[in-house]
Regions:
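Intrinsically disordered, low-complexity peptide-like regions
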Residues: 1-2, 29
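Bacterial N-terminal signal peptides that target proteins for export
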Residues: 2-14
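Surface-exposed, polar/charged interaction patches used for macromolecular assembly or partner binding
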Residues: 25-264
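C-terminal segment of classical bacterial N-terminal signal peptides
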Residues: 17-27
Length: 264
């Protein structure tokens, strides 16, 4: 009997609480409901990790930076350098390097003919000491281990994006520009949600950061294409772009077709 009475009181309390949350004129409750609805529709499409830890295609014929890592404090102990490690740069005070300057560390990876070389953003380093021809820097953020011979570029702040995944569906092949996936993250044959890939569409095709792309797969060249995923552009070069896979129902691989999503 006591258990039955306790259960009844518990149900009554729950009903009162639910009524209090839904009753008109309670802005806090309505605000929470509205917030929940918003978060179902929008989220962080481009994150700091996408901006500073992804890769891009260094295109054939483009010059490489002339600032490089020439050594490290612990280079006799290990080959890869991460956060808090001290590295030595190929230029110094006489070359205009200043204390406090921040550089992005990049490293060359796989060649992807005819587009260029996959270039990985390894992290960033800050100059802490100067000599005439050498700068001393400390790695502040590490995405991937930096190595002797890696290049450095002046660090530039990127801008993330909050928005809604437009999804993927059947599209008219003539509705917008099309291309192909030419490289998938870390040289896997296939890749999935949250990973990065390169496509052969860039500034030459008027592609911009934040554009969303639908990816299609064909079981055979003579069969209809099927939409398998959605992607967002996170970096744009002349003839290529880096994209992040937002969602997919099947593995995405090099050679899959892509098309700009014009859905509003």
């Amino acid at each position: 009997m006591k258990n039955h009475k306790g259960l009844s009181l518990g149900l009554l309390s729950f009903a009162v609480l639910a009524f209090g949350l839904l009753v008109p004129g309670r802005p806090f409750a309505q605000d929470q409901i509205q917030r929940a609805k918003i978060f179902q529709d929008t989220y962080e499409l481009i994150s700091d990790t996408d901006l500073y830890c992804s890769f891009y295609m260094h295109e054939e014929g483009k010059p490489l930076p002339d600032l490089r890592i020439i050594g490290a404090d612990r280079m006799n102990e290990k080959e890869g350098f991460i956060e808090q490690d001290v590295i030595y740069l190929s230029k110094g005070q006489a070359d205009g390097i200043e204390i406090g300057q921040i550089f992005q560390i990049i490293g060359l990876e796989d060649k992807v003919p005819p587009y260029g070389t996959v270039t990985q953003r390894r992290g960033r380093a800050r100059v802490i000491r100067l000599e005439k021809k050498v700068a001393v820097a400390k790695i502040e953020r590490s995405c991937w281990a930096a190595r002797v011979g890696d290049y450095l570029l002046p660090f530039e702040e990127g801008q993330g994006e909050i928005g809604k995944d437009k999804g993927y569906d059947v599209m008219d092949p003539n509705a917008s520009k099309t291309g192909q996936v030419v490289y998938v993250d870390q040289d896997y044959r296939t890749t999935g949600s949250g990973r990065w890939a390169s496509i052969n569409m860039g500034r030459q095709q008027c592609v911009q950061i934040g554009d969303q792309v639908t990816v299609f797969h064909r079981a055979r060249p003579n069969l209809p294409r099927e939409a398998v995923g959605s992607m967002i552009v996170i970096d744009v070069r002349g003839a290529t772009s880096t994209v992040k896979i937002l969602a997919c129902r099947d593995a995405i691989e090099a050679g899959d077709e892509v098309q700009l999503n014009t859905t509003r």
